[in-house]
A protein has these predicted regions:
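N-terminal accessory/interface modules of nucleic-acid-binding and processing proteins
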Residues: 1-174
Length: 174
């Protein structure tokens, strides 16, 4: 006999994850991410870091997006990462951009990976010294914060995409 633990589909309550496809439109993803942002969103011509397409300012609780950036993939990557910063600041009592930078990069990577946006620009292979020197329990706690922030952002994005898809299907019926 080969005994295994199995579940009946009726015993589960999870949603089916959207299939990753490389042909998703980064512009549509950007629009959706900005629509579901947990903080205020504002367009600007200049950011504190000129090579960034988006920047989260914790003092003002605002996500700034640079105007006229031609590369929609780069904008999607920056917005995803900065949404990570915004969600992490909401979920924690003491927020430090420098301390939570790696977690935000990981969240941006996971969002882009899940929605089919190129992820080569994310430096997730360099683990910060502060995280590498922690005890396993502390590392699990940090990873748990990252996972929770990612899950929250993803649920908002997928709910909004589903809502938009429903609206489009209703329009086609007319």
């Amino acid at each position: 006999y080969n005994v295994k633990k199995v579940f009946d589909v009726t015993q589960t309550n999870g949603r089916k994850a959207p299939a990753v496809s490389a042909n998703r439109d980064p512009k549509a993803l950007i629009t959706t991410m900005l629509d579901v942002s947990p903080v205020e969103v504002a367009a600007t011509d200049e950011l504190p870091y000129p090579n960034m397409a988006a920047f989260y300012n914790n003092e003002k609780q605002t996500l700034y997006v640079k105007r006229n950036v031609g590369d929609s993939v780069a904008v999607a990557q920056c917005v995803a990462q900065e949404l990570g910063h915004a969600q992490l600041s909401i979920n924690s009592e003491s927020y430090s951009r420098r301390d939570m930078g790696f977690q935000a990069v990981c969240i941006g990577y996971m969002i882009c990976k899940k929605y089919g946006v190129d992820t080569q620009n994310f430096a997730i292979n360099r683990i910060p010294e502060g995280l590498a020197s922690k005890e396993p329990k502390e590392i699990r706690a940090e990873l748990s914060k990252t996972r929770n922030a990612m899950a929250e952002i993803h649920s908002h994005i997928s709910d909004e995409m589903f809502r938009k898809k429903q609206e489009r299907s209703k329009d086609y019926e007319r």
